[in-house]
Design a protein with these regions (language model features):
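Hydrophobic packing residues within well-ordered alpha-helices of enzyme cores
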Residues: 27, 52-56, 162, 166, ...
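Conserved acidic, metal-coordinating active-site core of Asp-based
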Residues: 104-214, 218, 222-223, 235
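Alpha-helical scaffold elements within enzyme catalytic domains, especially in hydrolases
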Residues: 33, 97-98, 165-168, 239
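Active-site metal-binding loops of divalent metal-dependent hydrolases
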Residues: 12, 47, 215-217
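Short active-site oxyanion
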Residues: 38-42, 62-63, 148-149, 209-210, ...
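Mg2+-dependent phosphoryl-transfer enzymes with acidic/Ser/Thr/Gly-rich catalytic loops
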Residues: 2-7, 24, 185-267
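Active-site phosphate-binding/coordination module
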Residues: 20-124
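Short, structured coil segments at secondary-structure junctions
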Residues: 59-61, 69, 77, 169-172, ...
Length: 267
């Protein structure tokens, strides 16, 4: 079939979704056409693994997808976790210090299927509305282990201070990156969308002749770079545009039809 062996991984927010966080009919139709012709489509997002089933039930994913900014690869069809990377070491003392110093900033701890929050704010509420995740305010001692990702949500300037505070602590074991202007993600150092794509290519590569990835934010740069064909949307950060092979229109213009047009010269 036309797209046999071709895999597309797309970021969600700022890429596949428009400025209102909507998934357009044009993108859905293009994805369904791509899959019907033998293609494989997955997402690579900072969101939890539940988000696509809850918020985008019509989105067909037929390849294991990348969640938590690369800390987990999850097959939404089978419910199988292919791999996950959890934060090692005890972050609780550091997080307690930061949520005390920055009380206006929300801290969220992601564990498989659930999240625990401190200092809930409006940005958290926006996240809950758009992602459909389950959160709980809990005591530190009641939070289980195997943390996949920690988020801070707040004013960008405050988040820059928190990032700088982590840098001062010399926490080289962590990967700290902005997934959005008002969200700072913290994961194990080895966890990234690009690293997850590399692992998936090593697992399925013999059946994948061309891997395409699309993104917009700094956390997508390695994903775009590690693809055979890396694409930045027009609203992408300079870091993503620098490593991309092509730059298409911004996320308010459906990206998948543009990608399929670009693919014509690779078939």
């Amino acid at each position: 079939m036309k797209y046999d062996g071709i895999v597309i991984y797309s970021d969600l927010d700022g890429t596949l979704l428009d400025a209102e966080r909507n998934l357009s009919k044009e993108n859905l139709d293009a994805i369904n056409w791509f899959i019907s012709q033998g293609g494989r489509f997955g997402v690579a997002t900072g969101r939890m693994e539940r988000t696509t089933d809850i918020m985008f039930p019509d989105l067909h994913l037929n390849v294991p997808s990348i969640f938590f900014n690369g800390a987990m690869a999850y097959d939404t069809s089978s419910g199988k976790v292919l791999f996950k990377t959890v934060i090692s070491g005890d972050l609780k003392p550091v997080l307690k210090k930061f949520i005390s110093e920055y009380p206006e900033t929300c801290c969220e701890i992601n564990i498989h299927g659930k999240a625990y929050v401190f200092n809930p704010n409006d940005i958290l509420q926006t996240q809950l509305d758009r992602e459909g995740i389950l959160v709980e305010e809990a005591r530190w001692e009641d939070i289980p282990g195997e943390w996949i990702k920690v988020l801070f949500m707040g004013d960008h300037g405050t988040l820059e201070k928190i990032k700088a505070d982590f840098d001062k602590l010399g926490r080289t074991d962590l990967n700290i990156v902005f997934s959005e202007d008002d969200i700072l993600d913290i994961m194990e150092k080895s966890a990234s969308k690009g690293a997850a794509l590399y692992k998936l290519k090593s697992m399925f590569g013999e059946n994948w002749r061309l891997v395409v990835s699309i993104g917009d934010n700094d956390n997508d740069a390695e994903l775009v770079q590690n693809a055979d064909l890396g694409i930045a949307v027009g609203n992408a950060t300079p870091a993503v545009k620098r490593v991309s092979d092509f730059i298409i229109k911004d996320h308010n213009t459906p990206c998948i039809p543009q990608v399929l047009e670009l693919l014509e010269s690779y078939l």
